[in-house]
Amino acid sequence: MEFPFDVDALFPERITVLDQHLRPPARRPGTTTPARVDLQQQIMTIVDELGKASAKAQHLPAPITSALRMQSNRHVIYILKDTSARPAGKGAIIGFLKVGYKKLFVLDDREAHNEVEPLCILDFYIHESVQRHGHGRELFQHMLQKERVEPHQLAIDRPSPKLLKFLNKHYNLETTVPQVNNFVIFEGFFAHQHRPPTSSLRATRHSRAAVADPIPAAPARKLPPKRAEGDIKPYSSSDREFLKVAVEPPWPLNRAPRRATPPAHPPPRSSSLGNSPDRGPLRPFVPEQELLRSLRLCPPHPTARLLLATDPGGSPAQRRRTRGTPWGLVAQSCHYSRHGGFNTSFLGTGNQERKQGEQEAEDRSASEDRVLLLDGSGEEPTQTGAPRAQAPPPQSWTVGGDIMNARVIRNLQERRSTRPW
């Protein structure tokens, strides 16, 4: 490739190495600052043209090598110039090779992921007019010597078929290790990649470091003895008395006679409880069977026994059930056909029955008061007032000539059908 400026004056050596700064390899004596700026601009022009030619040869949509990318990455480019032909005394460029270190995640033979940072071949181009003349091998070999690497330790970024044939022909690199990215590695790549040092090498390094560093190590600080582990107590190390008290049974099993005097020694409180109120002792637990047995064996009250013995009508509940005739029963017996027509005597009879029940309740309360007085004093109180008139005998009403009480009428009403249809 030819350029309008003097390439021999810009690159005095056959192979020139440029870094990301793209500076001239050597300063000529007496070169001013504007001249140095012009030289750097010429180098940038050469790099851009080489990148375009490489992209065209590899059928890439855009060049992957340019002066701007070189300045933004820590890559190295090797430029090979033609020293035999001197057209118009300016020289020519044959090709270039761009390399750089990249952090990769690659797979080994066992398909295990490995994080490595090898030297990668990023771009390689030789002009079509001078190919198969050994210029590519010369440039590649110079790079290997400069970087001190072996061909099987390299990773190639998207190599072209021509580059793979070149590596197979000159360096016997044929078998590749399959990868999931665009890089290609060959067998032997993991032979010297991040191998951990052996114990002997590690011991040798420590001994060398001790000899190189004459400063004695600081004495080890004595640590306090480790305290023995004990039982973990809830919330604090103090005893909690209320946690040891039995749970109070539900009502009525917890009903017990209260003590007349408070306990002589109340349970102590924990110091960590603060101003929380004291919990009194729980009542003793009474089994359910003993409670039921005591209820069955409990004798009735004397007043209740006397009332049951003197009442001819049975229990008080029975008297309440049979007291008078409800208005509903009277209405039912009056309005249904099986009892005949409407009889107004039923209403009067019901009123008389209700008055009779009220009189019986008054007599019963008076008798209970008399029994209580007898139980308390042992003497029968004297009656100072006028004698109470006796209640008239209970009246009843007849149905079909038979005397029937309210209980029988109620049973009859419950057993029959109340539906009018």
UniProtKB/Swiss-Prot annotation:
The modification Phosphoserine is found at S272, S276, S315. Residues 209-221 have a biased composition (Low complexity). PROSITE patterns: GNAT_ATAT (PS51730). Its main location: cytoplasm. Changing K56R: Strong reduction in tubulin acetylation, no effect on tubulin-binding. Transmembrane segments: none annotated. GO terms for molecular function: acetyltransferase activity; L-lysine N-acetyltransferase activity, acting on acetyl phosphate as donor; tubulin N-acetyltransferase activity. Keywords: Acetylation, Acyltransferase, Cell junction, Cell projection, Coated pit, Cytoplasm, Cytoskeleton, Membrane, Methylation, Phosphoprotein, Transferase. InterPro entries: Atat, GNAT_ATAT. The record marks Q58 as: Crucial for catalytic activity. GO terms for biological process: alpha-tubulin acetylation; dentate gyrus development; microtubule cytoskeleton organization; neuron development; NLRP3 inflammasome complex assembly; positive regulation of NLRP3 inflammasome complex assembly; regulation of fat cell differentiation; regulation of microtubule cytoskeleton organization. Acetyl-CoA binds at residues 124-137, 160-169. Residues 196-235, 252-284, 342-421 are annotated as: Disordered. It comes from the Eukaryota. Residues 1-190 form the N-acetyltransferase domain. It is found in: Cytoplasm; Membrane, Clathrin-coated pit; Cell junction, Focal adhesion; Cell projection, Axon. It catalyses: L-lysyl-[alpha-tubulin] + acetyl-CoA = N(6)-acetyl-L-lysyl-[alpha-tubulin] + CoA + H(+). Changing K244R: Strong reduction in tubulin acetylation, no effect on tubulin-binding. Widely expressed with highest levels in neuronal tissues. In the brain, expressed in the cortex, cerebellum and hippocampus, including the pyramidal layers in CA1 and CA3, as well as the granular cell layers in the lateral blade (suprapyramidal portion) and the medial blade (infrapyramidal portion) of the dentate gyrus. In testis, mainly expressed in the internal cell layers of seminiferous tubules, where spermatocytes and spermatids are located. Belongs to the acetyltransferase ATAT1 family. This is Alpha-tubulin N-acetyltransferase 1. It comes from Mus musculus (Mouse).
